[in-house]
């Protein structure tokens, strides 16, 4: 039996072969990748069926997945502490990393997910909430700081 959504399975038969039991443990998706696959905690992919609407959507080349997985906890914690939910994470070579929240806030992080980028985002979000600001875009790609866009 070869199904990519199966984590493991067990087939039990009675001593006389009169009945069989099949136990299947399915993989638990952690992300939706490119709206075509699920990815689990072991970074293995399996078919996407449209379920689990609350999973974070990832759109990036496969080789960039580990960069996000290594940085995700601090970003998710930061956003959750401010009652924001990350809906999607993308990487495009021309744009870099960017996040979109459930409130349609776009955060352009730049070329890497470094600690400096995280600290700049943390300070920017703190400033926004202290001053009751609601931009549609936070752009952290500038060396001098962050740009806030209220256009959308």
PLM regions and their residue ranges:
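Stable alpha-helical elements in mature extracytoplasmic
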Residues: 2, 71, 75-78, 117-124
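Short beta-strands and strand-coil junctions in structured, solvent-facing domains, enriched
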Residues: 7-9, 19, 28-32, 46, ...
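Solvent-exposed helix-coil-helix hairpins and adjacent flexible coil/strand "hinge" segments
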Residues: 87-120, 144
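Short, well-structured beta-strand/strand-turn elements
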Residues: 2-18, 87
């Amino acid at each position: 039996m070869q199904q990519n959504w199966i984590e493991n399975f067990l087939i039990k038969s009675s001593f006389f072969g009169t009945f069989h039991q099949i136990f299947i443990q399915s993989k638990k998706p952690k992300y939706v990748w490119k709206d075509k696959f699920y990815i689990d905690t072991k970074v293995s992919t399996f078919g996407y069926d449209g379920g689990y609407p609350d999973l974070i959507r990832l759109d990036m080349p496969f080789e960039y997945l580990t960069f996000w997985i290594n940085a995700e906890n601090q970003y998710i914690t930061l956003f959750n502490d401010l009652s924001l939910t990350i809906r999607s994470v993308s990487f495009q070579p021309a744009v870099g990393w960017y996040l979109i929240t459930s409130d349609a806030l776009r955060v352009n992080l730049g070329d890497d997910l470094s600690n400096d980028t995280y600290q700049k985002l943390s300070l920017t979000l703190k400033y926004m909430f202290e001053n009751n600001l609601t931009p549609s875009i936070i752009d952290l790609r500038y060396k001098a700081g962050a740009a806030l866009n209220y256009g959308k």
